[in-house]
Each structure stands twice: as structure tokens, then as C-alpha cells.
Amino acid sequence: MKLKLNFLPYFSFIPKKLNTNSIIFKIIKVFFIAILLSNSIYLSFFENIFTQTISPFLAIWGLVLLLKSKTSKQYFWIGFFVGILWFWWIGLSSIYFNLNYLVPIIPIIIGFIYGLLFRLCYLLKFDFLRLCGIFCISFIHPLGFDWFNWGIFTVYGFFDPSYRGIICIFLIAYFIYEGYISRYYKIAIVLILFFSGFQYNEKQAQTLNLNYKLINTNISQDQKFLQENLKSNSDILIQDILQAINEKKELVILPETAFAFDLKNTKYELMLKELSYKITIITGAFHVEKEHTYNSTYIFKKGNVYILNKHFLVPFGEEIPFFKDLTKKYFLKNIEEFSKGPIQSKYKLDNQIITNAICYEATKEQNYQNSQIIIALSNNAWFNNSSEYKLQQLLMKFYASKYGVSVYHATNGKENIVILPKKLLSKDWKNLSKEIFNDKK
């Protein structure tokens, strides 16, 4: 006896008289599947125990419906909308280079790229191979940009935040879709896969020994680097540091390029050195050395300053990976490229080894390997009013959970966050059940 998947229609509320062959319906259908495959990003705006529970199951539903799509065009358009839903915000940064016309063009190009990748997966003859192809898209990193990662499916829910959890999610989707297995075998296989991918343990991460404070700033990108604002913004930061000292903090962490200039040999460097006798200061700023400009982390400690330079640079934001002359002539005329620092910078605080990460670097898996604590500085004002920072946080949560790392993230433009390895959702449900029953008593 075979299990028919009548419980997985595209929309159960669609009227029977609606023409399911119409272009509008087909667009709605592929867009809905793309939403399911992007649900983790948008449900993260409403994070609670219920959204966390359903998120991976919505992803499974999306994968099942993807497999039910029987034409290469459907695969293309699903990939197209997935690319846009994940990365529509990338074009927003072009506003600050006076390239406003690129805001809608860039997402369309990205959607087209992922549409082609999904369509290539359809060319594989068997459904299982197609699903394997979709899984492998996560390992394609154009220009080193690795933010398309199915691992975000496991940040929420019962599945282990690792490749074990991800693979089980994909296999569950395949066996739910597969029509040549009897109902009872199918149920057994899905249950085995669910418990194989289940999170049974919580990884323990080191936390900072020092009493710390994360400073959050909210300076818009179009105002941040204006010469007339540098002094007033810097003076506010000094006041924030003094406030942390009054609060008896031992460490204060400021965002990326909090001081939006080269700190060396300025009055603010002298002030920070003096204040560092009372509190350790970590801040972002530029660093110019021998005609090289770096996006850097400055560490002020007991009158000394240590500078760590960013290695992973944002393509076409901090470096131009190719066609440099053409790009500078017609598009990024005023861009100043950054130079690269060491691949993984570390320093010591209170006998703890800290990994340095600046914005984009906080989502690089290499920085989580052989790390215990990461202090990350970001400027999210580049992509204000977007889902960029939520995707960034999901990637950080995935890697922090996978490797057992704690992340202390100070930002400009969005809220600060401290990330620890994923807790057991089953525990949260158990605690919620106890609260409900205790209230009834």
C-alpha cells in the first residue's frame, strides 16, 4: 500500500475552479516553495519556541514540493526566487556609491544565477540526484561568498546543527516524496532519519572571564564617514567608554570602524591609550601602513595598542576581485580597496585566546575552527532595513553550534548579540510544559 501525499498540496485553500495552469498560479506556486526554503531567515524576526519548532519542517515541505516540480522551468524559477529572498539586500550597498539604479538589477542577477544552478540540478536524471545537486549548491561559493548555506535549517528546531542534521532533513524530504515505498516503511524510515538527525547534546563553549560591555551605535551609512561628523561621533564613543568604566566594566567592545578614520597618531589614540589603564578597549578603525589601508581591530590594553587587520574582504565592497580598471572607471570610481591581513588573527585576554572577526569574517567557517571565543565587530548600516543581519546571525549561530564557540558581536546599525551553541529545543518544550501544568495547579 503506497502513501499518497495528499496532505502536501501547494495551497489547501485554493478554490477548485481556479485554473492551476495559469501563469499567475504557477508564479505563486514557485514563489511559495522559495519562501519555504527561505523560512529560517524570515521567521528569525519572530523568534520563539513555536517558530523554532516549525522552521525545519517548513524547509522539509519546501524540499518535497521542489521534488514534485516536474519541469526545468519550475526549478529555475524556484532557484530564482530563492536567490532573491536570500540576497535581495546586496544591492542596497550600491546606494552609497551613487549607483542607485543597481538596487533592483543586482537581486535579479543573483536570482538568475541561482535559477541556473537549480535548473542544472534538474538535468540530473533521478530525483535523488537532483536533491543531491540542490544540497551541493551550498558548497558553491562565487568570489568566496559563502552565505548560501543550508545549515541555517538546523539553527532552529530539533535537528543537530551539523551536516548530520542537514543531511537528515534532505533525506526525510526525499523519502516523504518517494512514491514507491509502502506507507509503513516510509513512516519507519522518516522516524529513523528524524532521530538520527536529532540533537541529543549541547556543546559547551567558553565565555569571557572579563566583565564586558558591548557598545551599540546607530549611525547611518551616509553619515558615518562624513568629515564633519567624525569628531562628534568619536566624542560620543569616548563617553560610552567612560560610562563603561563608571559601570566597573573590565572590557568594552565597539563596532567595526567605530572610529571611521586611521586611529594611529591621532588625539583619540592617545585618549584610548590613557583610558586603557582603566579598561581594555576593543574597537574598529582604519589602519594605514606603507600605502596599504586595512579594515582593522584595535586593542588598547594597559597603555599599549595592538592592531589586527581583516583578511576576508567583501567582493566589490572592500576589494575588486577582477576587472579592476573597468570597475573603477564606470562603477566604483571613489572606492578605496583594502589590503588583506593574516587569515586568522588571535589575541589573549585574561589568559583566554580570542579570535578576531570583522563583519564578513564572522560568517567564515575557517574562523570557527580551532577557536573557543570570537569577538566580532560589524557595521550593518550598509544594509539597513533588510534581512542581511538576520542571515548573518543565523550563519554565526550555525557555526558557533557546530564548533562549540561563543561569539560576542558588537554592531553599528543593528542590535548587539551574544551567541552560544544551540540549546536543546526538547528541553525548552519540557520547561514550557512544566510551566503550563504548574499554572493550572
Curated annotation (Swiss-Prot):
Pathway: Protein modification; lipoprotein biosynthesis (N-acyl transfer). GO terms for cellular component: plasma membrane. GO terms for molecular function: N-acyltransferase activity. It comes from the Bacteria. Residues 215-441 form the CN hydrolase domain. GO terms for biological process: lipoprotein biosynthetic process. It is found in: Cell inner membrane. This is Apolipoprotein N-acyltransferase. The lineage of its organism: Bacteria, Pseudomonadati, Campylobacterota, Epsilonproteobacteria, Campylobacterales. The gene is lnt.
